Amino acid sequence: MDKISGAVYGGAVYVNLTPHELNVVMDDGEIVHIPPSGLKATCDTSTVPVRRIGGATGYRRCYGAVHGIPDPQDGVVYVTSGPAAEAAHRQDVVSPGDQIQLADGRRACKGFAVWDED
């Protein structure tokens, strides 16, 4: 994992595969800042028209193949968008948890959303 930035906390390296800076509130209350790594995970997306909603069409968004997630490495957790994490379906790929606003006005998330079955 040469020259990929991440944050180390609790025995894991968190690599942010989104273009956004992340503040994650850990279980002990610590706020861990995870900067963008410079890599970006993407997920193929298509839309299917479902129904009319007033004067607009309502679409179902469908997700397909994931791109840009490195191979698994011991102790490394990759943080991606929810759709990319769900499509990847790997234990080492997560997405930001519930969004909150900190007392100082910064946005953060509470932990991570997981998308594997284990």
Each predicted region: which residue ranges?
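Intrinsically disordered, low-complexity segments enriched in small/polar residues
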Residues: M1-V13, P19-D118
